[in-house]
Structure formats: C-alpha cells, structure tokens
C-alpha cells in the first residue's frame, strides 16, 4: 500500500533513502478521448497523439502559458514570446508558424467547447492551466475530422474533483516581478461535481514595455439528472486589463540590448486590452448500451483594443456562438461490425472592427468601421472496423462550408465590403496493424483544409516597403493539403513507451505572410509547400523513483515551387520561416514517492534540457536565427495528511544564461523576440479537505 507520508530530514538523505521511499508505479496511461472524436485508447488510435498530464503541468512553470507544457511534445514548436499582448507562438509540424499573434492552423478546444472561432484563429492563453487534468495534442490527418485545422488539435480537459468538498490556494513568485495567485474550490458527490478556479497573474516583464496583468475565472459543473444522462456547464471569464507590447527587434538591436523595446513602442504606449467571456453546455446521453448521443451549445463575447507603434489603434467587439450534435455507437448492425460516428456543427462569429489614428497611445480619430463575420457549418462521420484479428481500419470524412463577410460603414476612403466562400470535402483513412499486445504499427492519410482567418483578410498588401492597407482581402484562397503519416507505438510493459512517426504534408495555396509592419500583417497564397519529418517520443520509469522522457523532431519545411512576393522572388527550396530544422526535449525526474495519479510525494527533483535548431525569419531566407540549448532544473517537496495536501517547489530556467531568440515575427523588419536569460520561480500550494 502507498504510504501517506515520506519524511526525509535532509536533502543528503533523500537520495540515500530513495529505495525506501520510492513507490514502484507504472506510467499513467494516456487514454485519448479525442483522436477520432470518440473515446479510444491512445495506443490503438491510428494517429500521432500525445498528452501532458497534470503532474507535469503543475511543475513545468507558473501555469500561465501553454508553452510550458507543449515544449516537451514532438512535432510541436511552442515559443513564449514574453509578450503577453500577442499570445504564445505555437505551431504543429510547421502549421501555424506564420501567426504574428494568437494561434492559426490549429484547432483549440477546452472541455469539449471550441476555443477557436470558425475561421480557425484562437487564443491559447484562454486555457485554465491551473485546473487542467491534461493537455492532448493530435497531429496529422485525423485532425481533419475537426474541420478548419491543418496542423492539429490541442485540447484541455479540467480535472475531475475527488469525492467530498475541498479548497486550495496557491501562489507563485518569479523573476521580473512575476506573480500568480489562485484559489480553487471543488466538490463531488453522486449527483455531480463542481470545480471553480480563480487566478490572477502579473509581471513587470523582462523587456522594457512588457508588463502585463491577467485575471481568469474557470468553472465547470458536472450534473447527473439520470443514470444515463450527464450534463456539463463550463463558464470562463478572462480579463487582461493591460498588456504592454514591446514588439520585435532588429538583429542589430537584439545584439546590442535584448531588453530594449522596439521602435516607438514606449513613446506611443503600445499595448493591448482584452476581455473574454464564454458559456458552454454539453450533454451526453446513453440511448442504449451501444449508442450515445452528445450535444453542445456555447456562446461568448470578446473585446480587444490595441494601440500600435505607428500611431494607430484597432478595436474589435466580437460575439461568437455555436452548436453541435454527435451520435456514436459500437455497431452499425449485425452485418456491419465496428463502431460509427456522425456529427453536425454550426459555428458563427461576428465582430465590429474599428480603427483610426492615435496620439501618444490614445484614440485620435476614426478611419475604419466595419462588421466582419465568419460562419461555418460542417458534417462529419467516421467508421472504425476490424479487418482481421490483427488489422483494424478507420474511414472518415468531413464536409464543410465557411463564409467570411465584411460590411464597410466608413466609405469616405472607399468601400471594401466583400464576401468570400470556401468549401471543404476532406476524407481520411487510417490503418493499424496490431503486431503484438505491445506493438502497434499505423498509417493514416487525408486531405486537409485551412481557410484564411478574419485577421488575415483584414489587410491587403501595399507596394514593397509600405504598411499593409486596411482593405478586405478577397484574393486569399483556402490552403489544401495532403498528409501522410506512418508510425509505431511500442509498450513493452506498463513502465515504458516509445512512439516513432514519419510524416509528409504537401500543401497547395499555402497561406503565408506577405508584409508585416507596425502591427499590421498581410497575407498571400504560395503555390506549394512541403513539410516532412520524423518524430520520436520516449518515456520510461526506471524504478527507485527515477523517470525520464524525451521528444525529438526533425523537419524539413520548404517551398516546393518558386513564388513572387512583395519582398522579391522566393526560390523553390527556400525554408518556411519560423520552423526549426530540429528540436529536442529531455528530462530526468526523481521522486521519493508517487501517488496513484503519478504526482510526487515527499521530495522531488528534475533536470530538463531543450534545444532547437536554426530558423529563418523571412521567405527570402536572408535573416537567419541561430539555434540554442537550454538547461532547466526544479526541486520540490509535497506532504500529505488526512486532510492537508501541501507542496513547495522552486524552478530555475536557462541555467547557463544563454542569449537566444524565443520566436520570430515572419517577414518583419524587426523580427526578433528575445528569450529570457537565467530566471527563477518559486511556488506554494495548499489543499484542505473540508
């Protein structure tokens, strides 16, 4: 039986007593509920799927940025811009690397409720990491079933409260004035469960003009009105009253002083003010022992006010909503074995976009006033079936429509009203060879679809060297790609995992950055691109409290055809900006004991290494950014009694004090966003069973 306490009087005795205190535990199984949009063990899914569990989320950082968790997954480039006005830069297999802010080309979902609007853009900062049970990432063709997402899907799932009533409080302090405070309350009984998470985050920022403040509420109510029907209500309120924007630096400015802000950002008080509220309701009902009906409906609002470096402001007031219905079952009848899934979705986002000149960071006029809308509908289905005793297959398809609209009310500078429509028919095939109880080999292929976002059609390119114009860009086509992946999943025992995946994606009409200046970015279509690479993920419990994990990615992301942009001629073979040639993450953890959920008991320590290769910052490949290697370490102690559960921990990052580039702004004259030098954080968390 697991011990409730493991008290070791001195750090020197910790390692000597590891054999006494260590709990022999297996790795927590990665049960995937999302790869095929129905519950399925990740080992059997014909897809590249990985998850980060709560035990890692709680110690990987201050639980502010999704990059804290995603950096340890293969195929995912998660860069903390250290700029809270623009959100982290996240790409999967190179999809989404073009994003100057927010997330593109990747679908975001929180507790089953979309966190991306119909056009495909989303804000990863809206995830409540403090109360998350796990983060799942789907890469490759099976993400097609989610619609407007080429690179993959990122889902967060809130933890399920333990029986009874409990409350917790936590605080984190760190370098550059970082402070995060959180209070949580949860309760669970036979009738349902309640989880409430309230947090506040502040930082002075490492760079000049990079202070930020954020407040967040996340609440989830699980209700059971009958033995066969469950309801979930998810409420979120995310408020960022200020986030200063230091913008990017030129390579010369970065070498001179990486802490400085970009040109004109201080004098013109460049910043962003954001507020978002959302309500979602989900229902799951067992119609029979083999058939389940699921439904969801959600609505929300987001406001965004941004002051830019070239004396301008942009304001957005967005309302969004959607609904979905899904039916799944274990069989289509006695003559058709396997399981089926069919669903329909309708989503809508309407925003009032205004803009104009600014004077010293305040509004000084209006020269843009319009309504933008993104409206999508989709029908999807899949059928998973056993082909032989060792072979299983999956066939799926998604059919969808998306309409982007612009109604211009400021006509003195011309009428930029317009409408564009996109249609999607995306098939996907998957095959799994169950070679043995411990080895699965899989392959999948599909045709993906990615539309431009409202933000990407909001500006049109101007003559070379000029700032993009405020014209609705109806010339952008949707990108269409064909993806193929092959891989193996090896589970020699309950204490070790190995995943190896090779992939290739060829895209036509790739949406790429054309111009980027002073907070405005315009886009265009490139004739063709290719992404191909290899991903490896390994995890092992070595016994005596030691665990290791590693993730390796090698990727070649290039233009397959020559293209001309306002920058000049892009040669075939040029690299896609912001995508490293390779990246790696490795960690070695030790804990004197673990509970049944894999979280440490008593003392713990970890050492992490992270590296990524060179990147280019522009389509012409004239600006190159060197790769880097980073080293992080953490130590903690957790004590548990009958009613109390408390943890103290400390973490240091970039121990060797490397000067490096965290992310790049594609095709920008000042593309460099610096990474943090050596920094630290310390935290305390206490939970009481009431």
Q: Residue spans of the language-model regions?
A:
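Gram-negative outer-membrane beta-barrel transporters
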Residues: 389, 393, 401, 497-506, ...
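N-terminal periplasmic "start-of-domain" segments of outer-membrane beta-barrel proteins
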Residues: 29-61, 86-91, 106
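Extracytoplasmic beta-strand/coil segments of soluble accessory domains associated
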Residues: 34, 68-113
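Conserved C-terminal beta-signal and adjacent last beta-strands/turns
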Residues: 112, 383, 443, 575-690
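Transmembrane beta-barrel wall of Gram-negative outer-membrane proteins
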Residues: 166-168, 173-202, 207-245, 271-288, ...
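Membrane-embedded beta-barrel scaffold of Gram-negative outer-membrane proteins
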Residues: 187, 292-306, 434, 440-446, ...
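Short acidic/polar hinge/loop motifs at secondary-structure boundaries
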Residues: 105-106, 113-139
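Face-selective signature of the C-terminal outer-membrane beta-barrel domain
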Residues: 224-236, 273-411, 417, 432-434, ...
């Amino acid at each position: 039986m697991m011990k409730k306490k493991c008290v070791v009087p001195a750090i020197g005795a910790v390692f000597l007593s590891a054999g006494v205190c260590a709990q022999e535990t297996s790795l927590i199984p990665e049960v995937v509920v999302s790869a095929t949009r129905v519950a399925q063990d990740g080992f059997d899914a014909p897809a590249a799927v990985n998850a980060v569990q709560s035990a890692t989320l709680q110690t990987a950082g201050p639980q502010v940025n999704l990059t804290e968790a995603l950096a340890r997954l293969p195929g995912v480039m998660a860069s903390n811009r250290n700029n809270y006005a623009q959100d982290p830069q996240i790409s999967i297999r190179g999809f989404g690397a073009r994003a100057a802010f927010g997330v593109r080309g990747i679908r975001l979902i929180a507790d089953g409720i979309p966190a991306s609007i119909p056009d495909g853009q989303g804000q990863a900062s809206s995830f409540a990491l403090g109360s998350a049970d796990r983060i799942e990432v789907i890469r490759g063709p099976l993400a097609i079933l989610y619609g407007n997402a080429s690179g993959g899907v990122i889902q967060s799932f809130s933890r399920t409260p333990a029986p009874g009533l409990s409350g917790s409080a936590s605080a984190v302090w760190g370098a550059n004035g970082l402070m995060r405070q959180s209070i949580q309350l949860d309760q669970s009984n036979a009738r349902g469960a309640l989880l409430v998470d309230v947090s506040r985050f502040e930082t002075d920022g490492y760079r000049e003009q990079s202070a930020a403040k954020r407040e967040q509420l996340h609440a989830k109510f699980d209700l059971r009105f009958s033995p066969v029907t469950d309801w979930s209500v998810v409420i979120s309120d995310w408020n960022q009253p200020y986030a200063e924007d230091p913008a990017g630096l030129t390579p010369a400015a970065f070498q001179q002083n990486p802490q400085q802000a970009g040109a004109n950002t201080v004098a013109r008080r460049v910043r962003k003010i954001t507020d978002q509220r959302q309500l979602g309701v989900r229902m799951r009902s067992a119609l029979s022992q083999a058939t389940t009906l699921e439904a969801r409906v959600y609505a929300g609002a987001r406001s965004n006010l941004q002051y830019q470096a070239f004396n301008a402001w942009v304001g957005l007031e967005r309302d969004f909503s959607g609904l979905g219905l899904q039916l799944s079952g274990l069989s289509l009848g006695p003559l058709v074995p396997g399981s089926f899934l069919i669903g329909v979705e309708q989503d809508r986002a309407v925003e009032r976009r205004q803009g104009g000149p600014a004077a010293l960071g305040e509004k000084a006029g209006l020269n843009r006033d319009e309504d933008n809308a993104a409206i999508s509908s989709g029908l999807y289905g899949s059928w998973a079936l056993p082909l032989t005793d060792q072979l299983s297959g999956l066939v799926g398809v998604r059919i969808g429509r998306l309409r982007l609209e612009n109604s211009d009310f400021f006509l003195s500078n011309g009428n930029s009203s317009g409408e564009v429509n996109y249609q999607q028919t995306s098939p996907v095939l998957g095959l799994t060879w169950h070679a043995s109880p411990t080895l699965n080999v899989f392959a999948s292929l599909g045709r993906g679809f990615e539309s431009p976002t409202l933000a990407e059609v909001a500006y049109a390119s101007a003559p070379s060297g000029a700032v993009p114009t405020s014209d609705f860009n109806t010339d952008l086509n949707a990108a269409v790609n064909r993806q193929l992946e092959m891989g193996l999943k090896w589970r020699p025992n309950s204490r070790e995992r190995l995943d190896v995946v090779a992939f290739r994606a060829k895209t036509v009409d790739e949406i790429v950055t054309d111009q980027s200046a002073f907070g405005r970015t315009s886009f265009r279509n490139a004739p063709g691109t290719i992404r191909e690479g290899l991903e490896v993920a390994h995890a092992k419990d070595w016994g005596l409290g030691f665990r290791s994990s590693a993730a390796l990615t090698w990727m070649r992301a290039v233009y397959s055809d020559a293209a001309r942009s306002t920058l000049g001629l892009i040669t075939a073979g040029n690299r896609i900006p912001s995508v490293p040639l390779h990246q790696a993450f490795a960690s070695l953890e030790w804990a004197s004991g673990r509970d049944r959920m894999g979280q440490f008991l008593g003392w713990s320590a970890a050492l992490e290494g992270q590296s990524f290769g060179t990147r280019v910052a522009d389509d012409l490949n004239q600006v190159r950014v060197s790769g880097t290697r980073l080293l992080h370490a953490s130590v903690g102690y957790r004590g548990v009694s009958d009613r109390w559960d408390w943890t103290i921990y400390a973490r240091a990052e970039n121990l060797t004090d490397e000067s490096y580039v965290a992310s790049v702004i594609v095709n920008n004259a000042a593309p460099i966003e610096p990474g943090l030098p050596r920094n630290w954080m310390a935290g305390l968390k206490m939970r009481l069973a009431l």
